Amino acid sequence: MAKRIIYNEQARRALERGIDILAESVAVTLGPKGRNVVLEKKFGAPQIINDGVTIAKEIELEDHIENTGVALIRQAASKTNDAAGDGTTTATVLAHAMVKAGLRNVAAGANAITLKKGIDKATEFLVGKIQENSKPISDSNAIAQCGTIAAGNDEEVGQMIANAMDKVGKEGVISLEEGKSMTTELEVTEGMRFDKGYISPYFATDTERMEAVLDEPYILLTDKKIALVQDLVPVLEQIAKTGKPLVIIAEDIEKEALATLVVNRLRGVLNVAAVKAPGFGDRRKAMLEDMAVLTNGQLITEDAGLKLENATLDMLGTGRRITINKETTTIVAEGNEQAVKARCDQIKKQMDETDSSYDKEKLQERLAKLAGGVAVIKVGAATETEMKDKKLRLEDAINATKAAVEEGIVPGGGTTLAHLSPILKEWADKNLEGEELIGANIVEASLTAPLMRIAENAGSNGAVIAENVKTKPFNDGFNAATGEYVDMSSAGIVDPAKVTRSGLQNAASIAGMVLTTECIVADLPEKKDSAAPAGAPGMGGDFDY
C-alpha cells in the first residue's frame, strides 16, 4: 500500500489533532462530577462507561496520521492501567497538557531533544517528591477511602473492598463475578492464584476480555511434559462422557498435544484449557502438591508411581470455578478446609526450620496463596449496561487499593500534583538552565491540568481554583463534590501514590516521544470507488436499475 510521509511542524500538528480528540473525550469523565461516555457497539446494547482506558481503546479515527496521535496517548493510559490499574484519565490529561505546552515551544524554535531531557529530569525529581509525601496505609478505613474515590465516590464499594482485604489479607486475591441480584455482595472462598496464564489464546472462552472461565472443571495436575496426545486420550475420553470442562496444569504441553487440545476445544468436543505449572524444580512440584490438596486431587507424578495414561477421574482435582487470562490463573475450590489447614501447618513448620530468607519468602508466598483464599465480589445491577459500568469501576477500585497498600497514599483530587508545581519550579530554577529549564517548566505548567479539569467538570473556574490550592498547605485541596477547600486526608479524598507516580511517568514519556517526532510515515487513505452511474432513460439500456 502507498504511504504518506509528512515532516516537521505539519507532522506534529497532525499528531496533536488526534491527541486533542482523544484527550477531550476521556477528560469529560474526570472527577466526582465527571460525565459518562456512551460507546456504540456493533452487536448488543451501547455501553455507558466512566473509565478512561476503555474509552481510549474504542477511539479509531479515519485519518491515519491523527490516529497515530490517538494511539500514542492511548499508550499512556494503557501503561498506567497495567502498572497501577487506575489513574488512566489523569495520565491522559497530563500527557495532553505536556504535549500542548511542548509543541508551542518547539514551534518557537526550541530544541526538542533538550526539552525532553528537561522533562525527564523534572519527572525524576517529582517521583522522589511523591514518594516523600506518601503515607503508608495503616487501617482498613484508609483502604475504604481509596476504594471509594476510585469507584467514583461509592462508599459502599470502598467499604466492601476494605472488608475483603481484611478477610484475605494483603496477599489475598479479590476477583469479580456478575451477580444474580440487584445488590453487590461479598463472598470469601478458598482459592489460589498463580502467575501463569493459558498456553494458547485459543483456550479463551470470553474473547472480549481474553479470559478462559471454566465452571466446575476437573483439574489434571502433573509435573511432566505432555508430548504425545496418546498419553491423555484415556482421561479425555472419561471426561468427555461427564460433559464437564477440564483444566490441565503441567510442566509443559508440546506442539502436537497442544494442537489436538485446541482443535477439540474449537470444535466443541471438550471444553479444555491448559496452563504451565508455576515455579521451577522442587518448588514447582511443591506448588502442584498445594494445588492437589486445595482441589482434592492427586499430583500425577512418576515419583509416586502414577502415569498419565493410567489416570482416572478420581485422581483429578475439582474446583468451583477457574479463571485463566494471559498472565494469571485463579482456582476457586470449595469444601476441603481440613486438608488445606493441615497443609498450611506443614508450610509454617518448614518456615520455622529454614534459615534461608529466600526460602522463607517463597514459603510465605505459598502460605498466602493457600490460606488467603479468594474474595469474590458479586456485582449486582438492574441492567446489563449498568453491570458493565459497575464492574469497570469496581476493577479500578480494587486495583487502587492494592496500589495504595504497596506504595502508600497521597492527597487526591489532583491536589498532590498541583502542590508539587511550585516546588518543582523552585528546584528547576536552581538546578537547570536553558532549554532543559523550559522542559521542566512544561511539566510544571501541566501539573495543575488534572485539578483544573476536575474543577471545570464540576462547573467551577479551574484556573482560579488551581492558583488558590497552590497557596494552601500540602494536604489541603478542592473537594469538587461539595465545592469547598478541605483537608483532603480528613475528607477521605486520597489517591494511591503509585497511581499518581505511574500516570506522571507515562504522560512524560509519551510527551517526550511526540515532541521529538520529526517525520510520520502512514498509509494513504483508500479511495472509495464511486458507484457506476445508472442507465439514463433513452440510453437504450435493456434493464431497469
Swiss-Prot record:
GO biological process assignments: protein refolding
NCBIfam families xrefs: GroEL, PRK00013.1, PRK12849.1, PRK12850.1, PRK12851.1
**Subunit text:** Forms a cylinder of 14 subunits composed of two heptameric rings stacked back-to-back. Interacts with the co-chaperonin GroES.
One Pfam family, short name: Cpn60_TCP1
Question: What's the protein name?
Answer: Chaperonin GroEL 2
List the catalytic activities from the record: ATP + H2O + a folded polypeptide = ADP + phosphate + an unfolded polypeptide
Question: What CDD domains does this protein's entry cite?
Answer: GroEL
Return the broad EC class: isomerase
Indicate which residues the UniProt annotation says bind ATP: 29-32, 86-90, 413, 479-481, 495
Which molecular function GO terms apply here?
ATP binding; ATP-dependent protein folding chaperone; isomerase activity; unfolded protein binding
Keyword entries, A-Z: ATP-binding, Chaperone, Cytoplasm, Isomerase, Nucleotide-binding
Q: Which gene encodes it?
A: groEL2
The keyword Ribosomal protein appears for this protein:
no
